[in-house]
């Protein structure tokens, strides 16, 4: 019993004299560690006579508790002292200018999307949104896609097990809009779309803006004038444009729009930027609009495509790699 008392007295004195956290940790290990003095005393209880074990066990436990408490208190004192010393050593020059707050910036795709929708908003088009998970009717069938069309294939479209799919274009929003609004109407649909494709100029997820106008006297000339005005407003300069005949199931006739794009070396080449056409009569019938009375035109564009042209980006994937160094250029 006297051994544990003398051990405790000396240990408490050593703890009180410790001048650093490292020394304190060494004492903790030497006293309360697996091979520590107090731990060894506990292990030796079994060798004592039965009538002495209880008193000895209580004394050892009391010593262990006292040492644990002393170690904790001394640690707190040393940590406070270290903090005070560090604060005393640090000085603040109150004449230095304050740090400016970090300012965030819009992602270049968001900037481009807002620019596109803003231009069409000024032309009287209403922005509409729809679900990214679509059914076959809104994504394909209502838009005059035949059952054998390649776009319905698994390698082009992301399907769910129940037959639903990730929309491959925002045209489904147009179908919903025409079902809820009577002509005359003009609207644009903007948002994410998904296709099974990934390379330097394609991404499995990208952003699209599609526009629609339905009226009694809309013509291809109206479509051409609308797109010419948009291209001029977006790039803030005039371009020579050409409309090439092309096939899209939901328009007839259909066309792809090219602009005469000037290369860094001064040469010019035709660059495809849009798809468009007059709304197919079957699409109008599918949403309850009389194609004998109404005609319409539609157009669509990839937002990333326009962002790449506006900001001079060569690789589409750079927009989605979250490299802050790249994104800060556009903030």
UniProtKB/Swiss-Prot annotation:
Pfam families named in the record: Phe_tRNA-synt_N, tRNA-synt_2d
Q: What is this protein called?
A: Phenylalanine--tRNA ligase alpha subunit
Assembly = Tetramer of two alpha and two beta subunits.
Q: Name one GO molecular function term.
A: tRNA binding
Q: What is its EC number?
A: 6.1.1.20
The UniProt entry's sequence similarity note says: Belongs to the class-II aminoacyl-tRNA synthetase family. Phe-tRNA synthetase alpha subunit type 1 subfamily.
Species name: Stenotrophomonas maltophilia (strain R551-3)
Instruction: Name the SUPFAM superfamilies for this protein.
Output: Class II aaRS and biotin synthetases, tRNA-binding arm
Tell me which cofactor or cofactors this protein depends on.
Mg(2+)
> Where mainly found?
cytoplasm
Question: Keywords on this record?
Answer: Aminoacyl-tRNA synthetase, ATP-binding, Cytoplasm, Ligase, Magnesium, Metal-binding, Nucleotide-binding, Protein biosynthesis
Statement: the UniProt record of this protein carries the keyword Metal-binding: yes
Reaction(s) catalysed by this chain's protein: tRNA(Phe) + L-phenylalanine + ATP = L-phenylalanyl-tRNA(Phe) + AMP + diphosphate + H(+)
Q: What class of enzyme is it?
A: ligase
Textual note on the cofactor: Binds 2 magnesium ions per tetramer.
Q: Which InterPro entries match?
A: aa-tRNA-synth_II, aa-tRNA-synth_II/BPL/LPL, Phe-tRNA_ligase_II_N, Phe_tRNA_ligase_alpha1_bac, Phenylalanyl-tRNA_Synthase, tRNA-bd_arm
Gene Ontology BP term (one): phenylalanyl-tRNA aminoacylation
Q: Where in the cell is it found?
A: Cytoplasm
Q: Which residues bind Mg(2+)?
A: 252
Gene Ontology cellular-component terms for this entry are:
cytoplasm
Q: Which gene encodes it?
A: pheS
């Amino acid at each position: 019993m006297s051994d544990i008392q003398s051990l405790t007295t000396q240990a408490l004195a050593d703890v009180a004299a410790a001048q650093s956290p490292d020394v304190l940790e060494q004492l903790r290990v030497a006293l309360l560690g697996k091979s520590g003095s107090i731990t060894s005393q506990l292990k030796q209880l079994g060798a004592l006579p039965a009538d002495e074990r209880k008193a000895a066990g209580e004394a050892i436990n009391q010593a262990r508790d006292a040492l644990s408490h002393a170690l904790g208190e001394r640690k707190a004192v040393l940590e406070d002292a270290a903090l005070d010393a560090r604060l005393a050593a640090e000085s603040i020059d109150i004449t230095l200018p304050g740090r400016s707050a970090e300012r965030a910036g819009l992602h270049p795709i968001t900037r481009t999307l807002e620019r596109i929708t803003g231009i069409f908003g000024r032309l009287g088009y209403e922005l509409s949104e729809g679900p990214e998970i679509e059914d076959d009717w809104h994504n394909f069938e209502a838009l005059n896609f035949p059952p054998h069309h390649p776009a319905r294939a698994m390698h082009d479209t992301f399907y769910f097990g129940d037959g639903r799919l990730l929309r491959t274009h925002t045209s489904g929003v147009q179908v919903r809009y025409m079902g809820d609004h009577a002509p005359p109407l003009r609207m644009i649909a903007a948002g994410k779309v998904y296709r099974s494709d990934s390379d330097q100029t394609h991404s499995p997820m990208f952003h699209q803006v599609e526009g629609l106008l339905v009226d009694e006297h809309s013509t291809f000339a109206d479509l051409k004038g609308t797109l010419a005005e948009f291209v001029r407003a977006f790039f803030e300069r005039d371009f020579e444009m050409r409309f090439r005949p092309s096939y899209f199931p939901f328009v007839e006739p259909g066309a792809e729009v090219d602009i005469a794009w000037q290369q860094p070396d001064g040469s010019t080449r035709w660059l495809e930027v849009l798809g468009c056409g007059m709304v197919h009569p079957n699409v109008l019938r599918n949403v309850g609009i009389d194609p004998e009375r109404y005609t319409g035109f539609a157009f669509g564009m990839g937002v990333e495509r326009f962002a790449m042209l506006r900001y001079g980006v060569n690789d589409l994937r750079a927009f989605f790699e979250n490299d802050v160094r790249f994104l800060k250029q556009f903030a």
